[in-house]
A protein has these predicted regions:
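Alpha-helical junction/boundary sensor with strong preference for TPR arrays
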Residues: 432-436
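FAD-site-proximal beta/loop scaffold in flavoenzymes
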Residues: 111-138, 228-290
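Alpha-helical linker/edge segments of TPR/alpha-solenoid repeat scaffolds
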Residues: 446-465
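A conserved FAD-binding loop/helix module that cradles the flavin
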Residues: 273-321
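A Rossmann-like FAD-binding core segment of flavoenzymes
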Residues: 30-32, 71-87, 95, 167-260, ...
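Beta1-alpha1 glycine-rich phosphate/pyrophosphate-binding loop at the start
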Residues: 2-70, 149-187
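FAD-binding core/adjacent interface of flavoenzyme oxidoreductases
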Residues: 2, 70-158, 165-168, 235
């Protein structure tokens, strides 16, 4: 009887696991994706949307399922019967599994009452409204905050840097970043901290480190030190809470404990990956690495000639700035990590040149290559690889010139009717810009891709595109 792997979730860890399993173990088993949504949102890139940059469109999971022979099952996992190997969804329906991977993510919750919590695509319009209010002179002071205990702080720096660029020159407009960190993006080490301090200074962002928010009142953000920070607009990152799956163990914050190979403690044949686990750093690239470790473990159990290596986290962060992106990389020690003691950094790099390829926001071994073009590529593409940083520094003017050239080539190719080449040029532009494009070109990419698919359908009837 064919073994069945059930993957619960529709985020980056779940999709990475699908790609990894098919790459490692082929198609001699069934994969079902138990998904509450049939689209993978590019959540990390959504931070750029309020500033006139278009995030890549959501990935259609139906296309992924068709391409890789995956069953797509509606539902949100709420309960696991470990002994009977049954996974139940909202409404009570149960699904059998031989191997279960829980990749359901975490739940973002408001961290500061009265502040605008930026969680992703759903909050883009609210940030756009704030920027419009500042442009009209109705608001002046933006404060971006990071809640205590937050380990993945990079989106706050992106919000502050791009907000400062957008409001530059507006009368009395100020941007302040308040963080409990000792240094900016301290999780990446000294190289990142120094690079961020310089960048924040260049963009005119006031930085307050080792500062914890107490509460927010009318136009004043109060710190635990008693200091008052003027703020008629406060943007905050959320707290994250675990999924609390009935039948599975969890810590006090409802996150699922796992070993280095992804196995859930005390639950044979059940693994977990991504933000749902107790690993303290909640970041897309790390979630894909956990998914890779879990997929290798499952592939080995299915009989594939795979050596299941333990999760060895390498943190890769692409900081969107509105100009040339900043690439950050650090090796983390996966042993003995706790929320109380933090982690030990083993290596730290910061560069204006790509430190991995393809240079996506979510640096997944299989997911990044799959999403690196306008049309998702096959598994024949080489997996993500790290790169040695260039010794030279990319200059903003050179970056903009290269980006403008790529966009011009895309327009010229499209005007000549060569849509495949136009899409290649946009892929190059997106790589230069950290995966995001000006909104107009993001819309053109969707239009050109639709036209190309229509042409293909017309010339090859009966063949799916």
């Amino acid at each position: 009887m064919t073994e069945r792997v059930l993957i619960a979730g529709s985020g980056v860890a779940a999709v990475e696991a699908v790609l990894a399993l098919r790459h490692l173990a082929g198609r001699g088993f069934d994969i079902d994706l138990l998904a509450p949504s049939h689209a993978l949102e590019h959540r990390p890139a959504s931070v750029a949307a309020p500033f006139g940059l278009g995030a890549p469109p959501p990935l259609d999971l139906h296309e992924l399922a068709r391409r890789y022979a995956v069953g797509l099952v509606d539902g949100r996992l709420v309960r696991v019967d470990v002994e009977d190997r049954q996974a139940s969804v909202v409404g009570g329906r149960a699904h059998h599994f031989d191997h279960l991977l829980v990749a359901v993510g975490a739940r973002p919750v408001q961290s500061i009452p009265g502040a605008l919590t930026f969680r992703g695509p759903a909050d883009v319009r609210a940030v756009e409204w704030v920027l419009a209010e500042i442009a009209r002179g109705h608001r002046r002071q933006i404060v971006v905050t990071i809640p205590p205990g937050g380990t993945w702080t990079l989106p706050a720096y992106e919000l502050a840097i791009m907000a400062a660029s957008q409001t530059s020159g507006m009368p009395e407009a100020t941007v302040t970043l308040v963080t409990p960190e000792r240094e900016p993006l301290w999780i990446f080490g000294e190289a990142a901290g120094q690079a961020l301090r310089e960048l924040l200074s260049e963009r005119g962002v006031e930085l307050r480190t080792e500062a914890r928010v107490a509460h927010l009142t009318d136009d004043v953000l109060w710190l635990e030190s008693g200091e008052a920070v003027k703020a008629d607009t406060v943007l905050s990152l959320p707290y994250l809470e675990g999924p609390r799956i009935s039948g599975l163990p969890c810590d006090e914050e409802a996150f699922i404990p796992t070993d280095a190979h992804g196995y859930v403690m005390g639950a044979p044949n059940v693994l977990a990956a991504g933000d749902a686990t107790t690993f303290p750093v909640k970041q897309g690239g790390l979630a894909t690495q956990q998914a890779d470790a879990a997929a290798a473990t499952i592939a080995n159990a299915l009989g594939a000639a795979v050596d299941p290596r333990p999760f060895a986290p390498v943190l890769r962060g692409l900081l969107l700035t509105g100009g040339a992106p900043l690439y950050l990389r650090a090796e983390l020690d996966a042993q003995g990590i706790s929320r109380a003691t933090g982690h030990r950094r083993l290596a730290s790099e910061a560069s204006s040149h790509a430190l991995w390829w393809p240079p996506g926001k979510v640096a997944g071994r299989y997911l990044a290559p799959y999403l690196s073009t306008a049309r998702p590529v096959s598994l024949g593409t080489e997996p993500l690889v790290d790169r040695v940083p260039s010794g030279s520094k990319a200059h903003t003017a050179e970056h903009h010139a290269a980006l403008d050239l790529a966009l011009l080539l895309a327009d010229e190719d499209a005007a000549a009717g060569d849509l495949p080449q136009a899409l290649h040029a946009l892929d190059a532009a997106a790589a230069l810009a950290g995966g995001v494009l000006p909104v107009a070109y993001s819309e053109r990419r969707e239009r050109w891709l639709g036209e190309l698919q229509s042409r293909t359908s017309a010339t090859t009837p009966g063949v799916p595109t």
